[in-house]
């Protein structure tokens, strides 16, 4: 089976993994693909004002309508947010991780659902208990956006289902080898 089809990851992400790239490099590529990089504030799927790759706060200020940043400023904000997400993984995950696994967890927990929802989650508990396969299964349960079931395509959030599959693939990268 084609690796892209099997894991749903882009050729660019797979190439980085194959080349032995670092977690920051993999996460940057993955988040660019999932979040985009918007220099003008926009509402995310839950109606929250965001900018760049999903930042809700810039320089201590909440993102507001019509906020505009340069690409260079977004690059700086994105690097700060990426580094915070990866630092969270380093502090809170107690099992050894590969670079793709760090990127997958950073995207899912601190970056997308937030630490407040991650800490009590089955995913977090299973992962730190050493049940990696169970943790990867639990990522796929997070498929609601603003109360909408994203498996229902007419809810216009099916990308969430795809993202969870991809985050699960990264988080479990290599455990079956």
Curated annotation (Swiss-Prot):
Gene3D superfamilies: 1.10.530.40. One of its GO terms (biological process) is killing of cells of another organism. One of its GO terms (molecular function) is lysozyme activity. It catalyses: Hydrolysis of (1->4)-beta-linkages between N-acetylmuramic acid and N-acetyl-D-glucosamine residues in a peptidoglycan and between N-acetyl-D-glucosamine residues in chitodextrins. Keywords: Antimicrobial, Bacteriolytic enzyme, Glycosidase, Hydrolase. It holds the Pfam family Phage_lysozyme. Belongs to the glycosyl hydrolase 24 family. This is Probable prophage lysozyme. The gene is rrrQ.
